[in-house]
Amino acid sequence: MGKIIGIDLGTTNSCVAVLDGGKARVIENAEGDRTTPSIIAFTEDETLVGQPAKRQAVTNPTNTFFAIKRLIGRRFKDDEVQRDVNIMPFKIIQADNGDAWVESRGKKMAPPQVSAEVLKKMKKTAEDFLGEEVTEAVITVPAYFNDAQRQATKDAGRIAGLDVKRIINEPTAAALAYGIDKKQGDNIVAVYDLGGGTFDISIIEIDNNDGDQTFEVLATNGDTHLGGEDFDNRLINYLADEFKKEQGLDLRNDPLAMQRLKEAAEKAKIELSSTNQTEVNLPYITADATGPKHLVVKVTRAKLESLVEDLIQRSLEPLKVALADADLSVSDINEVILVGGQTRMPKVQEAVTNFFGKEPRKDVNPDEAVAVGAAVQAGVLAGDVKDVLLLDVTPLSLGIETMGSVMTKLIEKNTTIPTKASQVFSTADDNQSAVTIHVLQGERKQASANKSLGQFNLEGIEPAPRGMPQIEVTFDIDADGILHVSAKDKKTGKEQKITIKASSGLSDEEVAQMVRDAEAHADEDKKFEELAQARNQADGLVHATKKQVEEAGDALGSDDKAKIEAAIAEVEKAVKGNDKEAIDTATQSLIEASAKLVEIAQAKAQGAQSSAQGSSAEKTADDVVDAEFEEVKDDKK
């Protein structure tokens, strides 16, 4: 059986790890980096992922996608999506089913389809390291992801050719990474996870009992639209406003300028974690009738902190809720772990320290801990790690809509999963022959204020006065946090079941089509690579042949020379096209036409060898020097 890999599919960066000799190991990608930017670019010829995509973003902003995780499993009309529509350089559109999709070069794509490109890169990275095919993975998601977002993440895995064995919450994975080597005593750990696009807080109890470890999540909370991208956007808007004040031009209307501004803002934010002041200097950022314009703005750490102060405060509210849900106070927390790149900001660390009254641990790598934890969970599923039990929770309450548009909860938030709950309901009207089961996720009493996960009908109920029929509704949450619902008429035994797909989401047919597209792309990519190799080989041969023609000089007859030059022209023409066979044929013809050059080169080499031997014999004879000796007599002294 092949290895199960652990993947942290992040908003800004992704990371892959695997159990290697009993230890979780983060794998370096083809560029030699331990994390890969979650950036995907579509050019005319190919799909770029990671650093290569990031490098060309400035020149291709409308086809370069980043922070796609913020759109996954979301509706176009969601407030969070609408906030991003106006600031992203790429096009976010409404799909036919109401989901948020993106568009590149006239092609509409679902976020799972785009995220699948990052997962494919992670899969390939692991395969290159292991030297074998990888088909199974554990993928992490923010703890506060709802059912639709979890489903969409699984879909992305399927499109990438991966069987997703488990979806695991990011803070839980980080706690696994932290606690796996610490076998002494029991600990209550708070994991504060502020990543590129999402924020989670989880309170986790780690019990150690005779070498066996139990990781039990006591409570979780968060905000799936709060992260480093929001911090970047505050700085981007500040820089754009400063430029507008000075030059009277709004850079927000120029995607190219905004992409440069985004890169500069991200760099400045990172620099301000270790220095008190930096300068954002972008020459030729734009131009008007009077000529080119340059952006030069000094930014202090204090200024950045004032721009994002409310975002940091926003992250503290879920901490209070999580502690209350776990029925704990701040003093009950033994350790605080920081996860996610944004936690490197000193002001964030200061806020967390002040809240918990203790310094967070510094021995956990905020960029890699989640992938390491996913690899540990993969080891548990594969049977390679025996003494670890993970008890995760559902982040939001689940229930159905009942009379008066009220949400009636069947499973409360922070219930340990997997779990099952049943409740008996009845009809609202006399002789009602069908009921609609409307499944909801959230904490509000009013049904419409919660997230609708889907609905289905149970039909064929026997006519009876209202309140008489007994309809048993059962909610069953699996270990991935994905919900299965059934409704049963207890009198007739009629039953209707569904696995909740978001009221939108991708159908099985759509996912299957995307898998086929991805496979077709793999063939396309292979063909493109082969074409590039053929072109390189042809170019190299043309260069070498021209050099040989020059070196042959008069030794090459005019007929042969004309033949070679004609063959070179054919190769140069073929290289400009996209027909690999034509390039190969032209290359072969040039090799055959250059046979005379090979003969001349060999003759020259033999001539050089024999002249070298002749000169060495002469040199031996010449080494005998004629000389006259004079007798020196003592009296000459």
UniProtKB/Swiss-Prot annotation:
Gene induction: By stress conditions e.g. heat shock.
Pfam family, one: HSP70
In-chain residues carrying the UniProt-annotated modification Phosphothreonine: 198
Cleaved signal peptide residues: none
Molecular-function annotations in GO: ATP binding; ATP-dependent protein folding chaperone; unfolded protein binding
KW Cytoplasm (keyword) present: no
Keywords noted in UniProt: ATP-binding, Chaperone, Nucleotide-binding, Phosphoprotein, Stress response
InterPro entries on file: ATPase_NBD, Chaperone_DnaK, Heat_shock_70_CS, HSP70_C_sf, HSP70_peptide-bd_sf, Hsp_70_fam
Segments for region (Disordered): 604-637
KW Phosphoprotein (keyword) present: yes
Comp. bias (Low complexity): 604-617
PROSITE patterns cross-referenced by the UniProt entry: HSP70_1, HSP70_2, HSP70_3
Transmembrane segments: none
Disulphide-bonded residues: none
Biased composition (Acidic residues): 623-637
Family annotation (HAMAP family): DnaK
PANTHER family: HEAT SHOCK PROTEIN 70KDA
Role noted for this protein: Acts as a chaperone.
Similarity comment: Belongs to the heat shock protein 70 family.
Protein name in UniProt: Chaperone protein DnaK
The organism of origin for this protein: Shewanella amazonensis (strain ATCC BAA-1098 / SB2B)
